[in-house]
Amino acid sequence: GANGARDAQIVQAALDRLCLLEFADRQLGTLSGGERQRVMVARALAQEPRLLILDEPTNHLDIRHQLEVLALIRDLPLTIVASLHDLNMASAACDDVLLLQAGRSLGFGQPDAIFTEKMVSSAFRVQTCRERLAPSNTEHLTFKL
């Protein structure tokens, strides 16, 4: 019926948005880890949520697909809560971040205010340095034990 056709359109749009149309007829078990990750994000988008909670949405993805997924979810007209362990990626992709240590909040706010050398060093017990990269003129965190 009409609902089935609408559902098919929604699924098709989610697959298209994540460049997964070529995988539509494949079994999940035949896909690579990165392909499966993208399928799971598309599956969540097909539900048309207002709030999307993603646990490591870039895990198992090559850098191009990481950037594509983050750009895609950033452009969605909904609230996204995502766990990302790559602090530089989180800084570039997120409006606000929550820095946790052992399940406790160390800070919440804009990435530049939260991902300071002092706070990141404290959270992860590493030496942290914020450096400006040339020629992009972007800031980047580096770490040492």
Regions found by a protein language model. Name each.
Residues A5-F23:
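Conserved ABC ATPase "signature" region
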Residues L52-E56:
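Catalytic Walker B motif of ABC-type/P-loop ATPase nucleotide-binding domains
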Residues A90-A92:
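A short, surface-exposed alpha-helical micro-motif characterized by mixed small hydrophobic
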